[in-house]
Structure formats: structure tokens, C-alpha cells
């Protein structure tokens, strides 16, 4: 038996991984939390919808969580490492290896690796992401309430009527006028225009089919006067308080593929999430669990915390049943 064998290997140090570690500690399980310091909200100054941590810095949230875990619980360890390889050794053990060749073994594996956003090829998009381009108007946008204008980028997987209208309706809660940018997609423009005309909604919503050639920030994320400039192919520019776009995503890291895990169906080839059903979030391989952004299209901190807890409770249930030779709960 390897000297560095632990009960659970947790890959990912965001809210899901941190919650999984804390949950396992409460039942005296040994676990290692692997963190490569790469986070989806790393470009954001604030996080929301977390009681006691609403409109506060996500980096400080992670630091405070680490302090609580590693100050109070001796069975959890932290490794600042990027895991490059994961494999199932046998029915009882998993082995992971980092990019420097160091390896660890565990009885259970929790993947909380997060997801990778696939940005559209619009100049300036990456710089504005998380600052003036919002993927979720529950997470961002409230601070811009009563804005004169906001825009929807109806591109990528949002280039359809249901998603474009859903995002526009959310934006209309916060802005007086909402423009849906269809970026040269004439069929989508016509469909949206017909719906808006039929509903008599032209005073709030409008459609702009001009091709977007770039976006740029005005001000910074900490200023209530910040905005985003939309550059269009005809040379004109439009200033919006914020843009809404939920980019396509793919599972971050290749570990799920290496393990042969099933992925949830996706409309866009090469994108999607790890298939892991509630409430236990076990994947297609027994003993491997997924938590956080890597296993759901609803990528918010509150959801990551919830799934991290559930995955850890499920891993614990299997570990304890195996320890005592009992029939497992699942």
C-alpha cells in the first residue's frame, strides 16, 4: 500500500473543491486538495448570492476558506499543483500525477476542475469578460440597475430565439432599453424582430444585425460609471452599460477524457460538462465524483458549493460502507 494513500483526492481549489474538503474533514477523512490557482471568476472583482459574502472579492473568499480548513482540520492537505494525469489503478484506488511527475493515490476522486470558457473571436472580448460582459445577471448586473442601455450578444450557443429572449428579459430588469446584437445572422434577426413586433415590445427591446468588429472598456470594474463600447462594421460605435453573453464552455483539463467519463449531451461539438446526476454527483465510473462548474451548465458559486458538499458526502458514504464491509447506500 503506498505511503501517500488518502481517502479522497480533490482536484480543483475553487468553491466546489474547498467545500468538498471541508465536508470530508468533518468525518475525519483524509484528503488532498490540489489547486493550480486558475479560477473562472479570476477576472471578477466581486462575487454574489453567497450569504455573508455578497459583493465581496472571490480571491479573499478562497483565502478565507483555506484558512478555516487548514487551521481547524488536520486530515486535509493542500498541494499547489496542476494535475496532468488521472487513472484508475484497480477497483479500489485512483492515481493522479502532476505536471512535474509527482503522484498520489486515493480511494475516491472528486473532480472540481471547473470549466474553460470558449470566447468568440471578437477583439477586446477577453479584456471585457467578467468586467462589462456578464454571463449571468444574477451574479452581475444589479449594481448597474437603472442603466439606460444594455446589450445581448446573440452568438455561439446563444444564437437562438429562446436564449436571446431569456437573456434580454433578464437585462430588461436592469436597463431601460435592451439591444439584441445578432451579428449578421439575418434569419435570427428576422425571427426576433417578428416576435418583438407581435408582442408590442419595441419600446424596450430592439434588434441590431450589424456585425460586431470589437468591444472595449470604458472605465474599470470598480467604477459605477464603467461601460462597454461596441464597435460595428459600418464604423459606428454604441455605448452599453453592460453586455450579456454566456460563452460556450468545455471541461477544464483532460482528466475526464483520460478516465473515460461520460459527458452530458451538448448542442456544440467539443463542448459540454461531465455527466454526474444529482444528488450524489457520481460520474459514469464508480468512486469518481464531479462538482462545480465542470458538471453543470449553471455555473455559479452557490451551485458549486452545494455540489461540492453533496459529492463529498457521497464519497464518504462509499468509504464508510467499504470500511465496515456493509452494503453501500449506492
Residue ranges of model-derived segments:
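Beta1-alpha1 glycine-rich phosphate/pyrophosphate-binding loop at the start
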Residues: 6-63, 158-186
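A Rossmann-like FAD-binding core segment of flavoenzymes
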Residues: 63-91, 95-98, 175-273, 320-330
